[in-house]
């Protein structure tokens, strides 16, 4: 989560669960094609929490690319080539924030944040170019589950978490607090002043 003073927000567990399913599909697809590569772009403009957590949950991902880690495209392509030579398939999970490492901004949004194009097709093209340059054929299947990950009903864990958040909001209001957000920090529900966020 990239919200200050909030270690967990609602929807995270559901997003990870749905993303894991897409990674599973990418794994099946990559194994079902000769020299198959499943490339999955997951949400995370500035943070790779969903991508990293779904990677851990799936157990099928070979490369997890997040904006928090240094990224060297050439070194990645060499590692991917070695993986393909050895195993004949690979699954790559990448957070959309990786765009800041491999692309130039196309402008700025109203808040002043740099705007980047879609990193998924960009990386897919670079992978295909690399393998073509070394005379090796690969079949890259690109998955962009953005809306399917965002548009599902909350799972049981998130439903219970939201119920607890709402209960805490009522307790805070009844205690006379205003202009606060209910957060979750180190296992405890907290009241965070909105001006601190």
State where each predicted segment sits.
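Short, ordered loop/turn segments at secondary-structure junctions
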Residues: 1-3, 68-71, 96-99, 145-148, ...
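Gly-rich Lys/Arg/Thr-decorated short loops/hinges at beta-loop-alpha junctions or inter-strand turns
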Residues: 1-7, 32-35
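Short beta-strand elements at the ligand-binding edges of bilobed clamshell
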Residues: 5-14, 153-156
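Accessory alpha-helical/coil subdomains and C-terminal extensions
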Residues: 11-37, 41-138
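C-terminal non-catalytic interaction/assembly regions of soluble proteins
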Residues: 108-197
